[in-house]
Structures are given as structure tokens and as C-alpha cells.
A protein has these predicted regions:
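Intrinsically disordered, low-complexity terminal regions
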Residues: 1-10, 51-129
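Short, surface-exposed beta-edge/turn micro-motifs
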Residues: 17, 29, 35, 56-57, ...
């Protein structure tokens, strides 16, 4: 795998032939594309692609998941309004009413759909093959 330390800003892209861990944020307009998994230890607001070579078993995980788009293998999910700055989450879910940060989440493919759920040991045991 590969580690990238720093914030990816709009217009910047990071590509990896393996999995990638971003220690920082992926801002709106920035993109990460990995043949393996994508893990963002920060806020994910850009375009995140895992399994870029068609691997539907890859996943995307982030401490704060607010992406404009997630692609896993051949599957794509987009933000409900394309404006993650308004604290919208994928499919229109928003932060808690008291504006507390959301818990770390993971996006994965199941039954030909991309699902985003809070990371738990049980879930990791299910999706990591």
C-alpha cells in the first residue's frame, strides 16, 4: 500500500496501484483512485475511487465521510446535491443536530449497491475477504 501525508486540494489527484491511506483531508474537487482500498484519516469531501481495476470487493473508509462521489469497482454513488460543504452526506444524510462529527464510516459494495455504514469490528469481518 501507499501512504500520502497532507491535504489533497481541488484539482489534485492521487493514484495508486495498490491500496492508499491519506493522512489528511481530500477536499472537494480532489480525487483519489486506487486499485485497492482507500482510507482517509481525515475528511473525505472529494472523489474517491477504490478497486479502480474493477475490484468490487474494495472499500472506501474515512473518519468524516462527505464525498462528492464514491466509485467502487464498476459501481458509483454520488452526493445528493454535490455540495459537501453544506454538511450533507451521501444520499442526503446530514450531521447530528448538535453538529458533532459523525463516526468513521466505510463504503462497500453489496448486492450491486454501494452502502455506507459506521465502521465496526463485526462489519469489517463481514466485508473484508
Amino acid at each position: 500500500g501507499q501512504f500520502y501525508r497532507g491535504t489533497l486540494r481541488s484539482g489534485q489527484s492521487l493514484e495508486s496501484d495498490a491500496s492508499v491511506v491519506v493522512v489528511g483531508d481530500v477536499n472537494p474537487g480532489a480525487s483519489v483512485c486506487a486499485k485497492g482500498n482507500v482510507v482517509v484519516l481525515g475528511c473525505a469531501k472529494g472523489y474517491l475511487s477504490a478497486g479502480c481495476d474493477g475490484d468490487d470487493h474494495a472499500f472506501v473508509a474515512a473518519l468524516d465521510m462527505q464525498p462528492m462521489q464514491i466509485r467502487i469497482g464498476k459501481h458509483i454513488a454520488r452526493s445528493a446535491d454535490g455540495e459537501p460543504e453544506k454538511k450533507k452526506k451521501l444520499f442526503g444524510r446530514s450531521k447530528n443536530n448538535d453538529n458533532q462529527p459523525m463516526e468513521a464510516q466505510i463504503a462497500f459494495v453489496e448486492d450491486e449497491n454501494i452502502y455506507i455504514e459506521p465502521i465496526s469490528k463485526a462489519l469489517l469481518n463481514e466485508i473484508i475477504v
